[in-house]
C-alpha cells in the first residue's frame, strides 16, 4: 500500500514538473511575456515612435516603465495581469487613436518583466504605492488620469483610486477579479508553492502563482474600501471567461456604490483574453473614458 502511494506521488510530481516545463516553453518563449529595452525600442522605432524607457527604485524594488506620447496631454496608465509585462500593452501604446488624446504609460509590475522577474510582491496596496510614483514623482502627469487594469492588474488600478483619490480621474477594468474567491484556482496552485517543487517553477509562473495564492486574502482586505472610489468606471468582461468569474460584474455593481458612474459591458462569446481579441472595443472604452473625464474637468459634464 505504501509503495503504491509512493508511486502515485512520484507520478504526480513528474506530471507537475512536465506541465511546468511545457507551460514555460509555450508561454515564456512562444508568447512574448517580456521584451528587453532593445526589443521595445525596435518595436516603436519601426512605427516612427520614440519611447522613453526608465527604471526607478521604490521600497527596495527596481521597477521598469515605458512612456510614449505628448506629456502635455491627458494620461493613461496601463497595468498588466499575471503572468505578463508591460509589453502586453504594446499594441495599445502604439495606437494613434489613444496617442491623439493622451500620453501613455505602462509598467512592469514587481515580479514581472524587468522589475525583478520571479520575485513576486502579492501585497496590492504596496504595489499601488510603488506604481503611483510613475505619475506623481517621476513625471508630473497631466490630468485627467485614466488607469487601465487587466485581470490581476485591475485590483491594483482600483487600489490606486482608493488610496490616492486626487490622482485618478477614471478607471477602465478589463476581465477584473474584484471579489474574494471569484476566480479560478488550478489544482496545482497550492502544490506549486511546496519548496520541493517551487524551485523548479519558471520565474514568471512563480510570481503569478504566488499572487494567485494570496489574492483572496488581498481582495478581502479591500472589501471595506470600495466606497472610496468616486470616479467613473467602465467594466469589460467576456461572458465565457473561464479564469475570472463573470459574477465579478455583480460584485462591482454591489460595491462600487459611490462611483460617479459604472458602465458594465459583458461581451457575449468571449473569454478572458479580451484585451487581445477585443482590442478595438477596449481602446474605444479608454477613449470614451478620456473624453468623459476631460469634459468633466472642463465643466461640461
Give the location of each predicted region.
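Acidic catalytic loop of the alpha/beta-hydrolase fold
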Residues: 240-244, 272-273
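Short alpha-helix in the alpha/beta-hydrolase fold that links the catalytic acid
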Residues: 245-255
